Amino acid sequence: MKASKALVRRIRQDLMSKTSDAEKAAIRNCERLGYKVVRQQPILTGQKMYFADIYLPDLKTIVEIDGAYHYTKCQRRKDNNRSAGIWHMGYHVVRLSNHDARDINKVKAKIKLIKRRYRK
């Protein structure tokens, strides 16, 4: 997929204008924990471009916030395929429910698990 920089910028801006409350909470929590946060980071996996809800560049970790529709069978399959593609590009993926995204201790625990599992 070859998207122009202008198109990618427009898509990012549109996504950032629609940030959910849970995503805003997760961003605040990641920042409070001392991580640099990039919102709606474009990630190219083969022929597909995804926009990560939250990207923590120091950990090469993507944090995805899963609302209620992410728990349907069809969406879970799509999310698993997306996570696998992202993982194959060398990124780590943390998935948080809307509820967990608001809890700094749960955000911290998930990120700590990734750090422990994938130490450099």
What are these regions (language model features)?
Residues 1-120:
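Nucleic-acid endo/exonuclease domains
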